A protein has these predicted regions:
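Extracellular domains of the immunoglobulin superfamily
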Residues: 1-128
Length: 128
């Protein structure tokens, strides 16, 4: 069954760093254009963090704050994407999700512009 797997939840100290991993099979990864990262703080809606291109490793971020504190990357050989957050604040307490955007297909008419696979989420709690 096609799916994305994520690393486990954890409690982190203020100012610390954390890495969240998102991995899948080689077959799925090679048919993926973008791995998106989004988060959901308690009682809030989804917030888009950014994406990393599965093949090239190019990145794009949703805000300047994310660009300054979050690094998105991928290891193609391991079919894994990473999100590294530094300088954690209590506002970073959230569940973090990775989601796949596959390549568009001109043959099927599939634009590929939606998230068809999601990870189960990684809860990060920032504590003083």
């Amino acid at each position: 069954q096609a799916r994305l797997e994520q690393s486990g939840s954890g409690v982190k100290k203020l100012g610390a760093s954390v890495r969240v991993s998102c991995w899948t099979s080689e077959d799925i990864f090679e048919r993926t254009e973008l791995i998106h990262w989004v988060r959901q703080a308690p009682g809030q809606g989804l917030e888009w963090i950014g994406w990393v291109k599965a093949v090239s490793g190019a990145v794009n971020y949703g805000s300047l704050d994310f660009r300054n504190r979050i690094s998105l990357s991928r290891d193609r050989d391991l079919s894994t994407a990473y999100m590294d957050i530094r300088g954690l604040t209590q506002d970073d307490t959230a569940t973090y999700f990775c989601a796949r955007q596959k390549f568009a297909s001109r043959y099927s008419g599939d634009q590929g512009s939606y998230f068809d696979l999601w990870g189960r989420g990684t809860l990060i709690v920032v504590s003083s």
